Protein backbone atom coordinates (compact mmCIF):
# COMPACT_ATOMS: atom_id res chain seq x y z
CA UNK A 1 0.00 0.00 0.00
CA UNK A 2 2.85 2.38 0.88
CA UNK A 3 4.61 1.50 -2.36
CA UNK A 4 1.46 2.39 -4.28
CA UNK A 5 1.13 5.70 -2.39
CA UNK A 6 4.81 6.52 -2.98
CA UNK A 7 4.43 5.66 -6.65
CA UNK A 8 1.42 7.94 -6.91
CA UNK A 9 3.26 10.84 -5.29
CA UNK A 10 6.25 10.37 -7.58
CA UNK A 11 3.96 10.16 -10.60
CA UNK A 12 2.29 13.42 -9.62
CA UNK A 13 5.74 15.04 -9.52
CA UNK A 14 6.50 13.64 -12.96
CA UNK A 15 3.20 15.09 -14.15
CA UNK A 16 4.35 18.54 -13.08
CA UNK A 17 7.80 18.15 -14.65
CA UNK A 18 6.24 16.89 -17.86
CA UNK A 19 4.05 19.97 -17.88
CA UNK A 20 7.08 22.23 -17.49
CA UNK A 21 8.76 20.87 -20.62
CA UNK A 22 5.49 20.83 -22.52
CA UNK A 23 5.17 24.52 -21.64
CA UNK A 24 8.65 25.19 -23.02
CA UNK A 25 7.46 23.79 -26.33
CA UNK A 26 4.30 25.89 -26.21
CA UNK A 27 5.95 29.12 -25.08
CA UNK A 28 9.07 28.94 -27.20
CA UNK A 29 7.62 27.21 -30.25
CA UNK A 30 3.85 27.16 -30.69
CA UNK A 31 3.46 30.82 -29.70
CA UNK A 32 5.52 31.81 -32.74
CA UNK A 33 3.82 29.72 -35.43
CA UNK A 34 1.77 32.68 -36.66
CA UNK A 35 4.87 34.89 -36.72
CA UNK A 36 6.59 32.20 -38.82
CA UNK A 37 3.57 32.21 -41.15
CA UNK A 38 3.95 35.97 -41.64
CA UNK A 39 7.62 35.44 -42.48
CA UNK A 40 6.36 33.07 -45.19
CA UNK A 41 4.03 35.88 -46.44
CA UNK A 42 0.81 34.22 -45.31
CA UNK A 43 -2.45 36.09 -45.95
CA UNK A 44 -4.95 36.99 -43.24
CA UNK A 45 -7.11 34.07 -44.39
CA UNK A 46 -4.16 31.68 -44.08
CA UNK A 47 -3.40 33.03 -40.60
CA UNK A 48 -6.99 32.32 -39.59
CA UNK A 49 -6.83 28.85 -41.12
CA UNK A 50 -3.54 28.16 -39.31
CA UNK A 51 -5.26 28.96 -36.04
CA UNK A 52 -8.57 27.18 -36.66
CA UNK A 53 -8.14 24.15 -38.92
CA UNK A 54 -5.63 22.25 -36.73
CA UNK A 55 -7.93 22.60 -33.72
CA UNK A 56 -10.94 21.36 -35.67
CA UNK A 57 -9.19 18.29 -37.08
CA UNK A 58 -7.39 17.71 -33.80
CA UNK A 59 -10.68 17.10 -32.04
CA UNK A 60 -11.48 14.26 -34.43
CA UNK A 61 -8.30 12.53 -33.33
CA UNK A 62 -9.37 13.15 -29.75
CA UNK A 63 -12.61 11.28 -30.36
CA UNK A 64 -10.59 8.48 -31.95
CA UNK A 65 -8.39 8.47 -28.87
CA UNK A 66 -11.43 8.03 -26.62
CA UNK A 67 -12.44 5.02 -28.70
CA UNK A 68 -8.90 3.65 -28.46
CA UNK A 69 -9.07 3.78 -24.65
CA UNK A 70 -11.41 0.79 -24.74
CA UNK A 71 -9.02 -1.14 -26.97
CA UNK A 72 -5.72 -0.75 -25.12
CA UNK A 73 -4.75 -1.88 -21.66
CA UNK A 74 -2.45 1.00 -20.72
CA UNK A 75 -3.36 4.64 -21.14
CA UNK A 76 0.32 5.58 -21.30
CA UNK A 77 0.68 3.89 -24.69
CA UNK A 78 -1.84 6.32 -26.18
CA UNK A 79 -0.27 9.30 -24.41
CA UNK A 80 3.27 8.48 -25.52
CA UNK A 81 2.20 7.88 -29.12
CA UNK A 82 0.71 11.35 -29.34
CA UNK A 83 3.50 13.14 -27.48
CA UNK A 84 6.36 11.47 -29.36
CA UNK A 85 4.61 12.15 -32.66
CA UNK A 86 4.19 15.78 -31.71
CA UNK A 87 7.91 16.10 -30.95
CA UNK A 88 8.77 14.66 -34.38
CA UNK A 89 6.38 16.86 -36.40
CA UNK A 90 8.41 19.97 -35.51
CA UNK A 91 11.09 18.83 -37.97
CA UNK A 92 9.02 18.85 -41.20
CA UNK A 93 7.09 21.86 -39.88
CA UNK A 94 10.34 23.82 -39.96
CA UNK A 95 11.99 22.28 -43.01
CA UNK A 96 9.25 21.92 -45.63
CA UNK A 97 8.14 25.60 -45.80
CA UNK A 98 11.79 26.68 -46.14
CA UNK A 99 12.53 24.10 -48.84
CA UNK A 100 9.38 24.95 -50.82
CA UNK A 101 8.78 28.66 -50.03
CA UNK A 102 6.18 29.12 -52.80
CA UNK A 103 3.85 26.80 -50.93
CA UNK A 104 5.26 27.68 -47.51
CA UNK A 105 2.08 28.88 -45.75
CA UNK A 106 0.06 25.87 -46.93
CA UNK A 107 2.79 23.41 -45.94
CA UNK A 108 2.97 25.08 -42.53
CA UNK A 109 -0.80 24.70 -42.12
CA UNK A 110 -0.60 21.01 -43.08
CA UNK A 111 2.21 20.35 -40.60
CA UNK A 112 0.38 22.32 -37.91
CA UNK A 113 -2.66 20.08 -38.44
CA UNK A 114 -0.49 17.00 -37.85
CA UNK A 115 1.19 18.64 -34.84
CA UNK A 116 -2.07 19.56 -33.12
CA UNK A 117 -3.70 16.23 -34.03
CA UNK A 118 -0.90 14.30 -32.31
CA UNK A 119 -1.25 16.47 -29.22
CA UNK A 120 -5.01 16.02 -29.12
CA UNK A 121 -4.65 12.26 -29.52
CA UNK A 122 -2.92 12.19 -26.12
CA UNK A 123 -5.30 14.52 -24.25
CA UNK A 124 -8.20 12.20 -23.20
CA UNK A 125 -5.90 9.46 -21.89
CA UNK A 126 -3.67 12.05 -20.19
CA UNK A 127 -6.64 13.70 -18.44
CA UNK A 128 -8.03 10.33 -17.39
CA UNK A 129 -4.69 9.16 -15.96
CA UNK A 130 -3.66 12.35 -14.19
CA UNK A 131 -7.04 13.02 -12.61
CA UNK A 132 -7.00 9.45 -11.25
CA UNK A 133 -3.64 10.25 -9.65
CA UNK A 134 -4.95 13.33 -7.81
CA UNK A 135 -7.37 13.35 -4.87
CA UNK A 136 -10.62 15.11 -5.93
CA UNK A 137 -10.42 17.50 -2.96
CA UNK A 138 -6.93 18.61 -4.00
CA UNK A 139 -7.52 18.70 -7.73
CA UNK A 140 -7.89 22.46 -7.98
CA UNK A 141 -4.73 23.10 -5.96
CA UNK A 142 -2.71 20.48 -7.87
CA UNK A 143 -3.71 21.63 -11.33
CA UNK A 144 -3.35 25.25 -10.24
CA UNK A 145 0.22 24.49 -9.10
CA UNK A 146 0.95 22.58 -12.30
CA UNK A 147 -0.42 25.42 -14.39
CA UNK A 148 1.73 27.87 -12.41
CA UNK A 149 4.87 25.82 -13.10
CA UNK A 150 3.90 25.64 -16.76
CA UNK A 151 3.37 29.38 -16.85
CA UNK A 152 6.86 30.07 -15.48
CA UNK A 153 8.40 27.64 -17.97
CA UNK A 154 6.36 29.04 -20.84
CA UNK A 155 7.33 32.59 -19.89
CA UNK A 156 11.04 31.77 -19.77
CA UNK A 157 10.87 29.97 -23.11
CA UNK A 158 8.80 32.75 -24.67
CA UNK A 159 11.31 35.41 -23.62
CA UNK A 160 14.30 33.34 -24.71
CA UNK A 161 12.69 32.66 -28.09
CA UNK A 162 11.90 36.35 -28.50
CA UNK A 163 15.53 37.29 -27.85
CA UNK A 164 16.70 34.64 -30.31
CA UNK A 165 14.34 35.94 -32.99
CA UNK A 166 15.35 39.53 -32.24
CA UNK A 167 19.03 38.65 -32.66
CA UNK A 168 18.34 36.75 -35.88
CA UNK A 169 16.30 39.70 -37.16
CA UNK A 170 19.20 42.06 -36.40
CA UNK A 171 21.46 39.80 -38.48
CA UNK A 172 18.81 39.84 -41.23
CA UNK A 173 18.45 36.05 -40.99
CA UNK A 174 15.10 35.60 -39.21
CA UNK A 175 14.67 32.05 -40.51
CA UNK A 176 17.71 31.00 -38.46
CA UNK A 177 15.98 32.21 -35.32
CA UNK A 178 12.89 30.15 -36.11
CA UNK A 179 15.09 27.11 -36.79
CA UNK A 180 16.66 27.41 -33.33
CA UNK A 181 13.41 27.86 -31.41
CA UNK A 182 11.51 25.14 -33.28
CA UNK A 183 14.30 22.59 -32.80
CA UNK A 184 14.37 23.50 -29.10
CA UNK A 185 10.58 23.00 -28.97
CA UNK A 186 10.99 19.53 -30.45
CA UNK A 187 13.67 18.63 -27.90
CA UNK A 188 11.54 19.93 -25.01
CA UNK A 189 8.61 17.77 -26.08
CA UNK A 190 10.97 14.80 -26.21
CA UNK A 191 11.95 15.41 -22.57
CA UNK A 192 8.25 15.75 -21.74
CA UNK A 193 7.67 12.31 -23.28
CA UNK A 194 10.48 10.87 -21.15
CA UNK A 195 8.81 12.09 -17.94
CA UNK A 196 5.45 10.75 -19.06
CA UNK A 197 7.04 7.36 -19.62
CA UNK A 198 8.14 7.31 -15.96
CA UNK A 199 4.63 7.79 -14.55
CA UNK A 200 3.55 4.65 -12.70
CA UNK A 201 0.11 3.80 -14.02
CA UNK A 202 -0.18 0.88 -11.60
CA UNK A 203 -0.14 3.26 -8.59
CA UNK A 204 -3.83 4.08 -9.09
CA UNK A 205 -6.88 1.96 -9.90
CA UNK A 206 -7.66 2.09 -13.60
CA UNK A 207 -10.85 3.97 -14.44
CA UNK A 208 -12.34 2.05 -17.33
CA UNK A 209 -14.18 4.12 -19.88
CA UNK A 210 -17.74 3.13 -20.70
CA UNK A 211 -18.62 2.54 -24.33
CA UNK A 212 -18.84 5.87 -26.12
CA UNK A 213 -22.47 6.66 -26.97
CA UNK A 214 -22.79 10.42 -27.34
CA UNK A 215 -26.56 10.84 -26.90
CA UNK A 216 -26.70 8.44 -23.97
CA UNK A 217 -23.80 10.27 -22.34
CA UNK A 218 -25.51 13.66 -22.67
CA UNK A 219 -28.82 12.31 -21.31
CA UNK A 220 -27.30 10.98 -18.08
CA UNK A 221 -27.56 12.69 -14.71
CA UNK A 222 -26.33 16.29 -14.93
CA UNK A 223 -26.64 15.98 -18.72
CA UNK A 224 -28.65 19.20 -19.04
CA UNK A 225 -26.08 21.20 -17.09
CA UNK A 226 -23.26 19.71 -19.14
CA UNK A 227 -25.06 20.57 -22.40
CA UNK A 228 -25.47 24.14 -21.22
CA UNK A 229 -21.80 24.21 -20.30
CA UNK A 230 -20.85 22.95 -23.78
CA UNK A 231 -23.02 25.60 -25.44
CA UNK A 232 -21.48 28.33 -23.29
CA UNK A 233 -17.91 27.20 -23.92
CA UNK A 234 -18.43 26.78 -27.66
CA UNK A 235 -20.02 30.21 -28.07
CA UNK A 236 -17.30 31.80 -25.96
CA UNK A 237 -14.62 30.35 -28.23
CA UNK A 238 -16.53 31.48 -31.33
CA UNK A 239 -16.70 35.07 -30.14
CA UNK A 240 -13.12 35.25 -28.87
CA UNK A 241 -11.62 33.75 -32.02
CA UNK A 242 -13.25 36.31 -34.30
CA UNK A 243 -10.34 38.57 -33.33
CA UNK A 244 -7.89 36.24 -31.58
CA UNK A 245 -5.81 34.93 -34.52
CA UNK A 246 -5.30 38.38 -36.01
CA UNK A 247 -3.53 40.12 -33.15
CA UNK A 248 -0.23 38.83 -34.55
CA UNK A 249 -1.06 40.39 -37.93
CA UNK A 250 -1.94 43.65 -36.23
CA UNK A 251 1.22 43.71 -34.11
CA UNK A 252 3.84 42.58 -36.63
CA UNK A 253 2.47 43.73 -39.97
CA UNK A 254 0.39 46.82 -39.19
CA UNK A 255 2.07 48.28 -36.09
CA UNK A 256 5.49 47.08 -37.30
CA UNK A 257 6.46 45.71 -33.91
CA UNK A 258 9.81 43.97 -33.74
CA UNK A 259 9.92 40.34 -32.66
CA UNK A 260 11.16 41.57 -29.28
CA UNK A 261 8.19 43.92 -28.83
CA UNK A 262 5.79 41.18 -29.90
CA UNK A 263 7.44 38.83 -27.40
CA UNK A 264 6.99 41.42 -24.65
CA UNK A 265 3.30 41.64 -25.50
CA UNK A 266 2.97 37.85 -25.30
CA UNK A 267 4.97 37.81 -22.08
CA UNK A 268 2.64 40.33 -20.43
CA UNK A 269 -0.23 37.87 -20.80
CA UNK A 270 1.85 35.04 -19.38
CA UNK A 271 2.80 37.15 -16.34
CA UNK A 272 -0.88 37.91 -15.77
CA UNK A 273 -1.57 34.18 -15.70
CA UNK A 274 1.38 33.44 -13.45
CA UNK A 275 0.46 35.80 -10.64
CA UNK A 276 -3.17 34.66 -10.49
CA UNK A 277 -3.28 30.93 -11.27
CA UNK A 278 -2.74 29.81 -7.69
CA UNK A 279 -5.41 32.17 -6.27
CA UNK A 280 -7.83 31.08 -9.00
CA UNK A 281 -7.24 27.42 -8.09
CA UNK A 282 -7.94 28.11 -4.42
CA UNK A 283 -11.06 30.11 -5.24
CA UNK A 284 -12.30 27.23 -7.40
CA UNK A 285 -11.76 24.76 -4.55
CA UNK A 286 -13.49 27.03 -2.04
CA UNK A 287 -16.42 28.49 -3.98
CA UNK A 288 -16.76 26.11 -6.91
CA UNK A 289 -15.51 26.25 -10.48
CA UNK A 290 -18.86 27.46 -11.79
CA UNK A 291 -18.54 30.75 -9.91
CA UNK A 292 -14.97 31.25 -11.15
CA UNK A 293 -16.12 30.66 -14.73
CA UNK A 294 -19.08 33.03 -14.36
CA UNK A 295 -17.00 35.84 -12.85
CA UNK A 296 -14.24 35.71 -15.45
CA UNK A 297 -16.54 35.16 -18.43
CA UNK A 298 -18.34 38.43 -17.67
CA UNK A 299 -15.04 40.30 -18.09
CA UNK A 300 -13.81 38.66 -21.31
CA UNK A 301 -15.96 40.75 -23.73
CA UNK A 302 -14.34 43.97 -22.53
CA UNK A 303 -10.78 42.89 -23.40
CA UNK A 304 -10.85 43.35 -27.21
CA UNK A 305 -12.63 46.69 -26.79
CA UNK A 306 -9.53 48.08 -25.09
CA UNK A 307 -7.42 47.59 -28.23
CA UNK A 308 -9.55 50.19 -29.99
CA UNK A 309 -8.30 52.91 -27.65
CA UNK A 310 -4.57 53.06 -28.35
CA UNK A 311 -1.70 51.49 -30.30
CA UNK A 312 0.86 52.47 -27.66
CA UNK A 313 3.08 49.53 -26.71
CA UNK A 314 2.92 50.16 -22.96
CA UNK A 315 -0.87 50.38 -23.06
CA UNK A 316 -1.10 47.15 -25.05
CA UNK A 317 1.20 45.42 -22.56
CA UNK A 318 -1.14 46.43 -19.72
CA UNK A 319 -4.18 45.21 -21.65
CA UNK A 320 -2.62 41.81 -22.33
CA UNK A 321 -1.54 41.51 -18.70
CA UNK A 322 -5.17 42.02 -17.69
CA UNK A 323 -6.18 39.47 -20.32
CA UNK A 324 -3.80 36.95 -18.80
CA UNK A 325 -5.37 37.46 -15.37
CA UNK A 326 -8.89 36.93 -16.66
CA UNK A 327 -8.10 34.01 -18.94
CA UNK A 328 -6.13 32.22 -16.24
CA UNK A 329 -9.28 31.98 -14.13
CA UNK A 330 -11.56 31.12 -17.04
CA UNK A 331 -9.33 28.39 -18.50
CA UNK A 332 -8.68 26.76 -15.13
CA UNK A 333 -12.34 26.97 -14.14
CA UNK A 334 -13.52 25.45 -17.43
CA UNK A 335 -11.05 22.58 -17.21
CA UNK A 336 -11.86 21.73 -13.60
CA UNK A 337 -15.60 22.05 -14.21
CA UNK A 338 -15.39 19.27 -16.79
CA UNK A 339 -13.48 17.09 -14.33
CA UNK A 340 -16.13 17.66 -11.66
CA UNK A 341 -19.23 17.49 -13.86
CA UNK A 342 -18.83 13.98 -15.28
CA UNK A 343 -18.32 10.55 -13.74
CA UNK A 344 -14.73 9.25 -13.59
CA UNK A 345 -15.50 6.57 -16.17
CA UNK A 346 -16.87 9.28 -18.51
CA UNK A 347 -14.09 11.79 -17.94
CA UNK A 348 -12.13 11.17 -21.14
CA UNK A 349 -15.34 11.35 -23.19
CA UNK A 350 -16.37 14.55 -21.44
CA UNK A 351 -13.03 16.20 -22.17
CA UNK A 352 -13.11 15.04 -25.80
CA UNK A 353 -16.64 16.35 -26.38
CA UNK A 354 -15.81 19.64 -24.66
CA UNK A 355 -12.70 20.13 -26.80
CA UNK A 356 -14.65 19.19 -29.93
CA UNK A 357 -17.27 21.84 -29.24
CA UNK A 358 -14.54 24.39 -28.52
CA UNK A 359 -12.78 23.54 -31.78
CA UNK A 360 -15.94 24.03 -33.81
CA UNK A 361 -16.40 27.41 -32.15
CA UNK A 362 -12.72 28.18 -32.74
CA UNK A 363 -13.02 27.39 -36.46
CA UNK A 364 -16.26 29.31 -36.98
CA UNK A 365 -14.94 32.35 -35.11
CA UNK A 366 -11.59 32.46 -36.92
CA UNK A 367 -13.16 32.06 -40.36
CA UNK A 368 -15.76 34.71 -39.57
CA UNK A 369 -12.96 37.02 -38.45
CA UNK A 370 -11.08 36.52 -41.74
CA UNK A 371 -14.21 37.50 -43.67
CA UNK A 372 -14.91 40.55 -41.51
CA UNK A 373 -11.30 41.76 -41.80
CA UNK A 374 -11.72 41.91 -45.56
CA UNK A 375 -15.14 43.55 -45.82
CA UNK A 376 -15.48 45.96 -42.90
CA UNK A 377 -14.67 49.65 -43.60
CA UNK A 378 -11.59 51.30 -42.16
CA UNK A 379 -13.55 54.04 -40.42
CA UNK A 380 -16.99 54.50 -38.93
CA UNK A 381 -19.14 57.40 -40.19
CA UNK A 382 -22.53 58.31 -38.74
CA UNK A 383 -24.46 61.60 -38.88
CA UNK A 384 -21.42 63.50 -40.07
CA UNK A 385 -19.17 62.04 -37.34
CA UNK A 386 -16.17 60.01 -38.45
CA UNK A 387 -14.31 57.67 -36.12
CA UNK A 388 -11.07 55.84 -37.00
CA UNK A 389 -10.26 53.33 -34.23
CA UNK A 390 -6.62 53.10 -33.26
CA UNK A 391 -6.67 49.35 -33.87
CA UNK A 392 -7.97 49.47 -37.45
CA UNK A 393 -6.29 47.21 -39.96
CA UNK A 394 -5.37 49.20 -43.09
Language-model features: locations:
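Helix-loop boundary and gating motifs at the non-cytosolic
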Residues: 1-60, 65, 69, 76-86, ...
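Intracellular loop-helix junctions on the cytosolic face of multi-pass helical membrane proteins
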Residues: 1-14, 97-99, 103-109, 117, ...
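Intracellular juxtamembrane helix-capping segments at the cytosolic ends
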Residues: 33, 120-134, 329-343
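Helix-to-loop junctions at the C-terminal end of transmembrane segments
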Residues: 60-74, 165, 275-288, 373
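Loop-to-transmembrane helix entry/capping segments in MFS-fold secondary transporters
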Residues: 44-45, 134-146, 259-260, 342-357
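Transmembrane alpha-helix termini and helix-breaking/packing motifs in multi-pass membrane transporters
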Residues: 34-39, 67-71, 94-100, 154-176, ...
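Helix-loop junctions at membrane interfaces in 12-TM secondary transporters
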Residues: 93-112, 306-320
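Structural signature of the two symmetry-related core transmembrane helices
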Residues: 77-93, 186, 291-306
Amino acid sequence: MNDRADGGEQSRRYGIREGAFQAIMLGGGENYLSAFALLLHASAFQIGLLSALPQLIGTWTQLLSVKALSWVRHRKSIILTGVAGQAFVWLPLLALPLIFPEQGPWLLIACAVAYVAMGHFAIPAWNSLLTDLVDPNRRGAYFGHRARVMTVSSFAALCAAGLILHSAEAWEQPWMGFAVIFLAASAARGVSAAYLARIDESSVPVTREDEFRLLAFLRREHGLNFRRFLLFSGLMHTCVLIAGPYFVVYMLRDLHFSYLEYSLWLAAGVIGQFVTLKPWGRLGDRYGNKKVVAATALLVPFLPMLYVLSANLHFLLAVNFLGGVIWAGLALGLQNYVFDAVRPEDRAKGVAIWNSVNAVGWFVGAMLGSVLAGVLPGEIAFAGLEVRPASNLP
